[in-house]
Amino acid sequence: MHLELRHHAGGMPVLCVHRCVIVICVHGVVCFVNIFSADRVFLVVQMSIHPFVGFADGASRSTRNLSSAAWVIYDPAGELINLQGVCLGRTTNNIAEYSAVLELLTEAVNLGIRELLVYLDSQLVVLQLNGHSSVRNPSILHLYLRIRLLERNFDYITYQHIPRHLNTLTDAVANLVLERHLRNL
């Protein structure tokens, strides 16, 4: 995965993440996020009121029942300001997905972020966090309620589903964390 910051016509900085995301900024405010693969643009989001963008992902290895969580935050200038991952130990993939959102929101609060657009590749988590599906699992409900408490720190927060192949940076970090942990066992 490679990151680079380019300046295009009009001096607009564009953060290029190979085969993942382009964030275009005008006067320090994120205007568009283009998620793409090869030559096809899959998603264009107008974001004049959402200066910060976060991506979250959980990963698990069924053979070892190990899971990890990863999250990425871009600032209003389109700069990658936070990229982290953590091994969660033995847990389920759904708990890993929720843990990634929880860690992302915790970091955003610590950074003083008040408006956030969150992208996830887990449709179930997006449906539940947007109130379109209920949470029944007690372990997940605990994480869900912690996320709801953290949301009180934001003036605006929303969750959007993206296909798995468009969440490549956080997926790569989550899998790298798992691989490093497995090598150290």
Identify the role of each PLM range.
Residues 6, 12-13:
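Short, low-complexity intrinsically disordered segments enriched in A/P/G/S/L with frequent Arg
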Residues 45-95, 103-114:
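RNase H-like nuclease fold core
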Residues 59-63, 102-174, 180-182:
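RNase H catalytic domain
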Residues 98:
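Residues forming the Rossmann-fold NAD(P)(H) cofactor-binding site
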Residues 9, 17-21, 26-28, 33:
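Short hydrophobic alpha-helical segments enriched in small aliphatic residues
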